[in-house]
Regions:
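Extended beta-strand/beta-hairpin segments
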Residues: 1-53, 60-139
């Protein structure tokens, strides 16, 4: 894949078989999971949970960078709860999301500034911008 003066920092590789009722494994062996459909009684996780976990982790990293740009540190007890809805639409399926963000002890305006900065720089947030209805909520 060619890039325009971009430097690839990391490439994740997974092999998935069986779709929502299959398995997914990473090339380094660190990820080896069973997949199941949401709401089924089968063991395993689903793409929506994986997306939520990845986005939460990435967003926390982006908040750290945004806080650093403001010359402050994130509170020790910060967290992100990400909800991903699988939505049935007239033309198939789509996703919508809510990121509920806790930054205890920070002034509300400062916390909102960090969240806004992270939403602009987080690779997940950038990838879904204008395609997935997303709410960023300070809790």
């Amino acid at each position: 894949m060619e890039t325009n003066n971009e430097k690839v920092l990391y490439t994740a590789f997974t092999k998935t078989t069986g779709g929502r009722t299959g398995t997914s494994k990473s090339s380094d062996g660190e990820l080896d999971i069973i997949l199941s459909s949401p709401g089924s009684n089968r063991p395993g996780t689903n793409p929506e949970q994986l997306f939520a976990a990845g986005w939460s982790a990435c967003f926390i990293g982006a908040m750290g960078k945004a806080a650093s740009n403001l010359e402050i540190k994130l509170p020790a007890e910060h967290y992100v709860e990400t909800e991903i809805d699988l939505v049935s639409t007239d033309d198939g399926y789509s996703l919508q999301a809510r990121l509920n963000i806790s930054l205890p002890g920070l002034d509300s305006d400062v916390a909102k500034s960090i969240i806004e900065g992270a939403a602009q720089t987080c690779p997940y947030s950038k990838a879904i911008r204008d395609n997935v209805k997303t709410e960023y909520n300070l809790i």
